[in-house]
From Swiss-Prot:
Gene that specifies this protein: miaA
Residues annotated to bind substrate: 18-23
Binding site for ATP: 16-23
Lipid biosynthesis keyword on record: no
Transmembrane segments: none
One GO BP: tRNA modification
Highest taxon of the lineage: Bacteria
Annotated HAMAP family: IPP_trans (MF_00185)
Region annotated Interaction with substrate tRNA, chain positions: 41-44, 165-169, 247-252
Name under which the protein is recorded: tRNA dimethylallyltransferase
Enzyme nomenclature, EC number: 2.5.1.75
Essential cofactor(s): Mg(2+)
Length: 317
């Protein structure tokens, strides 16, 4: 197979909420078709964050290499803009090898930015940020979230009341432009994206079963050594709960436990709750998207159904 001269070579997007079985399904596809997996996960880009991000283990990676994981250390930052640049570069390389990129993950913003590009948001303004930080010191971030709810209810609905970085950025955009950030994101122009995408979404037919999976998943992570993983990362890289890496679901809650802010039982409870909230947001993103081939991630014959559908698309001829 040779795709380099095709104007719009194929790519497969495999999306779904956390604990929906995306990674296992990607392996099934990779064992059946000439694809290469690209991770679309804002936690898996960090080295050493293996357990809490459900990163594929070394045995799987030796069998089926994955792109865009283990890119940076936990004390570094990784943006959606950089993801788009990295992903497009890897996708072109995969296509040049006569294979099809298979993008797998649950970071819906990355999928959106990859297809549509980034909105022309204003750069950070130090004076505005300092003013917002001072207001937050006086009132607290939940109060700042309430202010955002008045100025930009759409964006506020997507942000947790204690997510200081995202609240600050959304308010900053409002103050600098006089417009809600959600409005500016809706107005962004489609960027160049030279691939023909086949979209697959894994959605739960019964959300309570997904919730049970999430509970078991977090318990398994703790049993596998998540607390020690976070402790070692903090010692080696001197990161705290405010760093982007440690704001990832699961890591944030363990940081709070290690800082003696919450008990072990409370850490378990909030870790599961935060993961369920993440799944809820992911499902909201997916239900707003069009052109999806939707499958019940709880279906017993899921792998066979998806493989048959991919085969019928003639992506590899």
């Amino acid at each position: 197979m040779n795709y380099p001269d095709i104007e719009s070579p194929p790519a497969i997007f495999l999306m779904g909420p956390t604990a929906s079985g995306k990674s296992a399904m990607a392996l099934e596809i990779a064992r059946r078709f000439p694809v290469e997996i690209i991770g679309v996960d804002s936690a898996q880009v960090y080295r050493f964050m293996d357990i809490g991000s459900a990163k594929p283990d070394k045995l799987i990676l030796s069998e089926i290499p994955h792109h865009l994981i283990d890119l940076i250390d936990p004390d570094e930052n990784y943006s959606a803009a950089r993801f788009r640049e990295d992903a497009l570069s890897v996708m072109r390389e995969i296509t040049a090898r006569g294979r099809v990129p298979l993008l797998v993950g649950g970071t819906m913003l990355y999928f959106k930015v990859l297809r549509q590009g980034l909105a022309a948001l204003p750069p950070a303004d130090d004076s505005v940020r300092r003013a917002l930080e001072q207001q937050a010191l006086d009132k607290g971030w939940p109060a700042m979230h309430a202010v955002l709810s008045q100025l930009d209810p759409v964006t506020a609905g997507r942000i947790q009341p204690n997510d200081s970085q995202r609240i600050q950025r959304a308010l900053e955009v409002c103050y600098l432009t006089g417009k809600p950030m959600s409005e500016m994101l809706e107005q962004q122009q489609n960027a160049d994206f030279p691939f023909r995408v086949f979209n697959i979404a894994l959605l739960p037919g019964d959300r309570s079963v997904l919730h049970d999976r999430i509970s078991q998943r977090f318990a398994t992570m703790l049993e596998a050594g998540l607390i020690d993983e976070v402790r070692l990362i903090r010692e080696q890289f001197h990161v705290n709960g405010d760093m982007p890496s440690m704001r990832c679901v699961g890591y944030r809650q363990v940081c709070m436990y290690l800082d003696n802010e919450i008990s072990f039982a409370r850490m378990q409870e909030t870790g599961v709750f935060a993961t369920r909230q993440l799944a809820k947001r992911q499902l909201t993103w997916l239900r707003s998207m069009s052109g999806l081939q939707i499958f019940d991630c709880l279906e017993n014959r899921l792998a066979r159904q998806i493989i048959d559908l991919i085969q019928a698309q003639r992506l590899f001829s």
